[in-house]
Regions:
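Short, low-complexity patches enriched in S/T/P/G
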Residues: 1-5
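Hydrophobic membrane-insertion alpha-helices, especially the h-region
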Residues: 7-22
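N-terminal Sec/ER secretory leader and immediately downstream segment
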Residues: 21-22, 26-128
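Residue-level detector of alpha-helical secondary structure
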Residues: 37, 47, 54, 58-65, ...
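Generic structural signal for hydrophobic core residues of well-folded globular domains
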Residues: 61-64, 90, 105, 128, ...
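Residues that cap or delimit alpha-helices
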Residues: 86-87, 91-117, 139-143, 185, ...
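Extended amphipathic alpha-helical interaction segments
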Residues: 114-199
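A cross-kingdom marker for long, charged
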Residues: 191-238
Length: 238
């Protein structure tokens, strides 16, 4: 899988993780660090499916809060761990759940770009210019749908329709990716490298956001089964 495709997968999946760290807006965060989490559907599913992981993350956040860490510092510490968990779930989720998961990622990205190109870039590439918390910027109804998609994906990955990735699926995904990448390389020219080197996107924030959305828009235009295969392959090689 092309490195650019892997990076494109990382940035759009990573942004979804922040929904699990929504405690930042709750007045009880200092006295009861996990109180706000109890109302978060995705957090409840994690607790049900992997209680040891749930406790480890919860304990880590309590310690960081006591140390006076900022909201963004806690997000930056916890996000990679939850991302890894979600990537594993995507491998076993049915096609429709995988595609919906990515579709809502793209809807979030488009909504963030309507706020500003800079916010969109920070949303996708927090390591480059510093992140932005979408819970503070985007419409609540969109975030609710984002979180519901997370829940449905995680539950489906452990349900009776649990998916098994085959070598044929991976081979088909690689074949589907090639013309998409060629098309984008021709369209964007040298700027196509922004997918691989996002730090070069400073000053080209709009173009960087457009490129990520163009990439995944092309993937989502594929038939559902094949789009899901590309998504699974991209995140599996992160």
């Amino acid at each position: 899988m092309n490195k650019r495709m892997r990076i494109g997968a990382v940035v759009v999946i990573a942004v979804a993780v922040i929904s699990v760290i929504y405690f930042s807006q709750q007045p009880s965060r200092d006295s009861q660090p996990d109180a706000a989490f109890n109302d978060m559907p995705a957090w409840q599913v994690i607790k049900e499916q992997d209680p040891a992981f749930h406790k480890r993350i919860q304990d880590q956040m309590v310690v960081m809060q006591k140390e006076g860490k900022t909201e963004q510092q806690i997000i930056d510490a916890v996000q990679p761990q939850i991302l890894k968990l979600q990537v594993g779930k995507l491998q076993h989720a049915p096609d429709k759940n995988v595609v919906e998961y990515m579709r809502l990622n793209m809807e979030q990205t488009a909504a963030m770009q309507k706020v500003s190109d800079d916010d969109c870039f920070r949303f996708l590439y927090p390591a480059v210019k510093g992140g932005v918390n979408p819970m503070r910027v985007l419409d609540k109804s969109l975030m609710d749908r984002r979180m519901q998609a997370d829940v449905e994906m995680m539950r489906a990955a452990a349900g009776p329709d649990r998916h098994t990735v085959t070598q044929q699926e991976r081979d088909t995904a690689r074949a589907d990716v090639a013309p998409i990448m060629q098309k984008l390389a021709k369209k964007y020219g040298d700027d196509f490298q922004l997918l691989q080197n996002p730090s070069k996107g400073v000053g080209k924030e709009k173009l960087s956001c457009d490129l990520v959305q163009d990439l995944w828009g092309n993937v989502l235009d594929l038939p559902e089964e094949r789009a899901a295969g590309v998504i699974r392959l991209a995140v599996s090689e992160m």
